Structures are given as structure tokens and as C-alpha cells.
């Protein structure tokens, strides 16, 4: 098992502790496995990739049969059981047919009678929360499968939810829980920086026909240059998105824009401040389109900003949200980009006179770099979100379950994201932030007839 863990650690940086814990829990096939392991964490934390690689190495180096499936693909219990049996008992071929959990357990018991000594079985189920929608006995049986089949078998469940969400009235067997926390900023930069050589080779291939640019690229694109770029990139993106695959994809897209003035010879590769001024606008435009996969036409690359804005407008106009959800989205944007101390002046009609002071006048003379709409979103509480929502909505609406469910819909669509307290929504300690940009919310405002700029401190 030590050899397996050692081979996986270079492939999954910053996950050494999780790999070591998983190795200690599983051990060798000659040792007794735990009956079930629950691996959970947010998307982009490496659950699926790590488990798949771990099972693959166990299958190669040990006397273990493995099965890995995605519960989303299994729309019936029968399909899921047949996929599992096909992986765990490949010698049987088409003879294996199961209709329910009882048949599945019986087939595995037959495997116990014919299995090789010290043979182990590992089953991994991705998106395990979907098991709750299947037959009522599926999840309890999977958790006790080792006991029922008399096999050295372990079921690894993968999900984004904590295991408390799985409990029902009849109860479930105890399970070993392993949490994969989100990467911090330094870890994210280390992971993104680990593919430097691959990114550099792609750039060299891209400029292979242009000798002048190829020479500049070979000299300028060093590991320090790439790390400086990632540092600037994460200063914009890290608060809004911590999904590593998504960040990796967006970072590669924006690198060519960052490199452009260096290739033209107008900016030195070590002049980070000028490179930041060049890349700041495109990075903020890309931030409004993260997860959306909006591509620029190749023939219009030069008109970068105009194309991005046009794509955002089209997306905002075609976004089919309920009427109140659009106002909730506007309220979330206002809460993310206005200071809480300004709420009374912005949303209360009779807030009293405000004296003009020189300090206030100077503070309002903001440059583009200091405007809150370009600095990125700030977190806010649900109480503040609802207070702004009721302030900007002309009609009176009761606080119903339907209204609160629309907040979770916006989170599911990645228009809002949780910063903290995701499990404590009803207690009021949860904090969110708005992930959309100014151009997007202005178009939403036009659809519902609301002037967003009028309620933004940056434009007052």
C-alpha cells in the first residue's frame, strides 16, 4: 500500500494527507477492509480523480477487483447492479442478470465461494446522493454489503453533501467519513503551476511558424513568469471560484492575452505592474463568464471587450428565471458591490440629509481600478439580501418557501456562491457572494425595468 500511495502523491499535489488516510483505511487485500467509506467535499477538490486512480493502482498491484460508476448514469437500480456485477465478476459474461438487491447479494455470495484467497473487492459510487432516489433498500444494503456477502469488500461513496443528509427514519449503518477540504490560495497556485511545462509546450507549438515570437516566447515564458501570472489571475478569480478544473481552463485561455504585449515588444516580461494593467480588464470580463463556456469567434479576436459584452447581453436576455428570482439576483449584486453602511442611504426613502465633506468628495473621485464593481464581489448575509430585495421590489410579497428556494436555484446555476455557513442557511449565519458581472446585471435590470446603476455607489 505504501508503494501505491507513493505513486499517487506526485499526481495529486496537496492531497498527501487524504491519500495516506485512504491507504491506511484500505490497506492490503490480505487485511480486512472497512465495510464503507464516505468521501465528500465540494466540486473540484479531486474526489473522483483521486478515487479512480487509487482503484486503478489497487487493481494493478494487488489481488483486487474494482468497480467505479456514476450514479447519475444509473437511472434504474437494475442498471447500476448490472454494471457493478459486470466489473466484479467479468468471467460470468452475459450469464449475470439481476433485477433487485436480493439477486445482487446472491450473485456476490457465489463469488465468495469461488474467490481466490486474499482477494479483495472495491466499489466506488460517484454522486452517491442519487442513491437516495433509488429503491429504499439500495443504500442500506450497500453499506452492509461486506457483512451480507462474506467478502472482503469495501464500498466507497463520493458526494458533495455531508453524510447527515443521507439519514432516514430507519437509520443507516456506521460509515467512515473522509472530508476533502477546498484548496487554499497557495495550494491552488501550486496545482495550477504544476502543469507549467505542458502550457509552455503548447505556446511554443502555437508560435512555431513565427520565428520572432517563438524566440521571445522561449526567453520570456519561464516558471517565475508563469507563477506571477497565476498570482494575478487568482487575485481576481479565487474569491469567486475555487473549482480547480474550471480555474485551470480559464487560466490557460487568458494566458495568451497576458503574453501579447510581451510578444509585441511593448512591455518587458518582468514589468508586472504594466502587465497587470493590460490583463485586468480581460480577467474581469472572463470572471463574468466562468462556467458558461462562451467562446469568441476567431476572426474577431481583436475586438475582445465588445464581443465579451455582446455574449453577456445575449446570455442575460435568454436566461429564463422567475420574476422574483431576477430581483433576488439584482439584490445580490447590489449587496456584493455596495458597502453595508450605505444601505440606509440607498434604499430608505427618508434617510435624512447627508453633509458634504471634503473627505467624502475625495473618496467618491474613484479611479476605475478602485471601483467596487471591478474589484470583485464581497460577501453578504441572507438577511441583508432579503432586506434589499424587499426595498427594490415595489409590490409586497410574503416570505414563502418558494421565494427561499429561488436562492438555492441561483446557487445551483452558479450565479451566487456560498462563502461560508452553507449548512446553516436557516440560522442566518450563511454568507454568499454574487458571481455575475456589471454588464450581466444591467441586462437583467432592463428585462424587469429596474435601473441598477441608480443603486450602485460607484455611479453616484
Curated annotation (Swiss-Prot):
Oligomer and partners: ORC is composed of six subunits.
GO molecular function, one term: DNA replication origin binding
One GO term (biological process): DNA-templated DNA replication
The name this protein goes by in its record: Origin recognition complex subunit 5
Species of provenance: Drosophila melanogaster
PANTHER family named in the record: ORIGIN RECOGNITION COMPLEX SUBUNIT 5
Main location: nucleus
Entry annotated with the keyword Nucleus: yes
CC terms in the record's Gene Ontology section: nuclear origin of replication recognition complex; nucleus
